[in-house]
Amino acid sequence: MNDCPSPDDAPDQAVPTPGNRWKLSAKPMSGARWDNRWEETEDTGETSWKKIPDLRLRGSIAIPRENAPGTGVPPIPLTVYLLAILLGFIASFDVSVPRPIMLLGSAMIFIPLFFKSLQYPLPALMALIVYIPYSKAVSGNLGGAVTGLNFTTAIMLLCFLSASAVSRRDAPLAVLPGERSFRHLVVLFCILGAFSVIHTDISSSGFGPLSALVDYKRWLDPFLVFFVFSYLLKTEEDGRLLVTLMAMSLVVIGLGTFEEHRINGMAHHLVRLTGIAQQANQMGAFYSNYLMIMIAFFMMKGLGLRRRFFLFFGLGGSLLGLFMTESRGDALSMAIALMFFFFIRSRILFLGIVALLAVAILNAQYLPGGLGTRLQRTVVHQDANSLDQRTTLDASARTRLALWKGATAMIESHPIFGVGYKMFQSNIYRYVPKNDETAHLSLRNRDAHNAYLLIGAEMGIPTLLVFIYLIFSMFRVSFYSFWVSTDRFWKLVCLGTASTVVSLAVTNIFGSRFNSMIVTGYLWALLAIILKIPIWQMNKISQQKT
């Protein structure tokens, strides 16, 4: 081993062969490190020793003042912009599209998209990015002859066809161990989810194989988004375009919130905004999660005055939408994610955000959209002239506490396999405490209002532990990509993604948001994209050296 060659003797370009493990440039270079291991290789019948390059990159939390030369925010095709605006218009103004027009429009979009996707996967990926937030508001039931055939399924099928065509023509992009391990973890969680569905199908007479398959496919949709982007995306340029398109789609949704605010303002009483999620708490989670991505883009260099102008109003609309959902848990998650984002980005801005949040909490009555009123009603003070002068929580908070206690009891009763997928609501009333405090609460057929407890109750403690580790891994891979990237664009995108994971981890405490395509679809796409950053970074360094 003392006769091993030095790193300087390594070849300039590594050539993968069956007898060695070279994957990237073999010479030590700025931004990369050497492993201390050596490997015996047999390339020409002779035994030699070669040093294995370490796949880890040196990193930093410092965000460059400018993007790397030749990079930045890419332009988006006009037709894609128009499609995003059309979907936003239909969802925001609640436009009812006649079936003949919908089918004709679908044919005009999907037929050209089909042929383009066979040549290159980017068109199908762009269509998926534009459509994900509207998967419930504009579901696009294509005929009803086949169960589950809608726009989501159609675009997914296009992506799979594109993957099949591209895999036969192009060489796959190298996959680093970190991305491979994360894929395996997601697969494990999906398999455990399938076991839960099978458990329900076996133990419940109300579930048939077809209904179980459709339900599982809906539960699986967000994870399919991850795998579609993970296997189809190859180039950094495509990644930039898709992330930019995502940010611009969020702007369209934020601008549409102003119209919903106008409609709700015409009501004689406060109405919680349900938005494109068609449910107030889920819509609040959507705003809370993806405000971080919009803030990250607002800090981009080279964004352009016009884009920055629309992004500013999109941000304002999303913040207003969060207030209009009146979701206290989502507001809390947004505050925590904001503090995390600016703590990493700038200590001065972090102190400003903390001061701003403190002022908002102390003056909650002035918050728009009804959130301030709901925050003030959380704690109920009894009339001083009443015999009972206790301070209690409002009915909503007391209901959640009772449901959480019931979910805990359910987990204790079924610790390994749980009660089965989608069986929580039909079983919860048996486990909630029955006393004077819960006597007047509505506790039958209720959701857990906590993703962790819901997964533990329906799927068991082993699946819950995998889920918690999955959340941790989502944060770890986003922060690692943030750490190793040297480009301002990707630094901010990765920081926004890590902040979104922080927001999701908190919103899961107050609601069952994790398997919602609308709430988590973009996050899974982002994770698949930023997992490519280390390999893009190493390829870039290798090209600079050669």
Model-derived features with residue positions:
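Long extracytoplasmic/lumenal interhelical loops at the membrane interface
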Residues: 267-274, 387-405, 413, 417-459, ...
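Short aromatic-rich membrane-water interface segments that cap or initiate transmembrane helices
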Residues: 140, 208-219, 271-284, 450
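Short, aromatic-rich membrane-interface segments at the entry and exit
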Residues: 95-106, 119-125, 145-147, 240, ...
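N-terminal hydrophobic segments of proteins, predominantly signal-anchor/transmembrane helices
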Residues: 112-215
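Alpha-helical transmembrane segments of multi-pass inner-membrane proteins
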Residues: 2-6, 33, 37, 46-50, ...
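Membrane-embedded alpha-helical segments of multi-pass membrane proteins
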Residues: 98-110, 132-135, 146-166, 216-225, ...
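Transmembrane alpha-helices of multi-pass inner-membrane enzymes
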Residues: 338, 470, 495-546
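A membrane-periplasm/extracellular boundary helix in multi-pass inner-membrane enzymes
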Residues: 264, 320, 324, 345-391, ...
